[in-house]
Amino acid sequence: MAAALLGQIIPSPAIPSNVFFISPKYDYYQAHKHEYDTLFFGSSRVHNQIIPEVFDSTSRQAGIAVNSYNFGVPAMRAIDSTVLIKEVLKDPPKNLKWVFFETTLDKGYEPIFNARTYRSMYWHTWENTGFAARYILSSEVSAASKAALLVSHCLPALYRQMNVGRLFSQTLSSEFSAEEQAEAAVFTRNEGYAPLIDENSPYRQDFLQHQDEYKAAVAELTAIASTPMPNTAIAENKRMLLAEVTRVIRTAGAKPIFIEPPSLEPEQDFRAAWQQGEIETLLAYKDPERFPQLYRVDQRFDAGHLNGEAAQVFSQLLAQDFVK
């Protein structure tokens, strides 16, 4: 009870200062947002793969002057990505023109082990938890799956209401580690972008040891990409989320541009949504036949991400398609 009262007396900020990746980016953005007319939102496939400096210079060479910021955050999913873009664009840059958005339209799961982390608790207001519930309940998964998914959001919502993170800060550090501070310094210098360079990363080592599996996955994706898509409507929850993202961006006075990065995921939700008129503009790169340079082994950091060299190529391609 005392914890809940504390939250009423001293409400938590919309985006607190202790959520790694999100807080440093948000703080920098708030201080500099009116310098930018273009924003990128998404997961690590934005954070580690879109270089604002390269995108801006390529666009300028083609005759369109832009100044962009990379608001990508590793491990973002569909629901929290939507919550973040809504919060950031509540008070948009005065010259905002374009907003790029990337996500995977997943089932809406919030990992249980994240329930007592600042990153999960901060955004689980009752309003945002209600949005998550609508996304889950209007999905096509089974009733049992919906129940499990709902629980995954109710826990951090309850913890937030109880101010668990604030009362037990001894176990949830409110300061970034030296390693996190160093990483934040890198992406702050690079307008939000950070290359993947850790050769000792488990993901990197796994990729190096299983390249045959990667090549097989690329071949499978090539076959999927070359097959005509059936004219099947995307699920109601996915339409709802895309409509909300579109509404938020347009309300901020910008044009929404959706991105399908060069991943290995077989889902074609963004393409289906574009074909069915749910989204207006899509820049799609998940096709090894059309973009072999983005799927070569020597251009990947791991199976799911480009290395720094390929990120430059991808940023150039994105800008070239943007200015067309």
Predicted regions and their residues:
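Membrane/wall-proximal cationic-aromatic binding patches
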Residues: M1-V66, V83-L84
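A structural motif corresponding to the C-terminal end of an alpha-helix
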Residues: L242-P256
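Extracytoplasmic/secreted proteins, especially bacterial periplasmic and envelope-associated proteins
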Residues: I50, V54, D80-L84, L149-L150, ...
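Secreted/periplasmic serine-hydrolase-like ester/acetyl group-modifying domain
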Residues: T117-M240, E244
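Residue-level recognition of beta-strand->loop/alpha-helix junctions
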Residues: N70-G72, E260, K286
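Membrane-embedded segments
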Residues: F41, R45-I136
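C-terminal regions of proteins
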Residues: Q268-K324
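Acidic-and-aromatic substrate-binding clefts and catalytic sites of carbohydrate-active enzymes
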Residues: N48, P74-D80, A233-E236, E260-D269
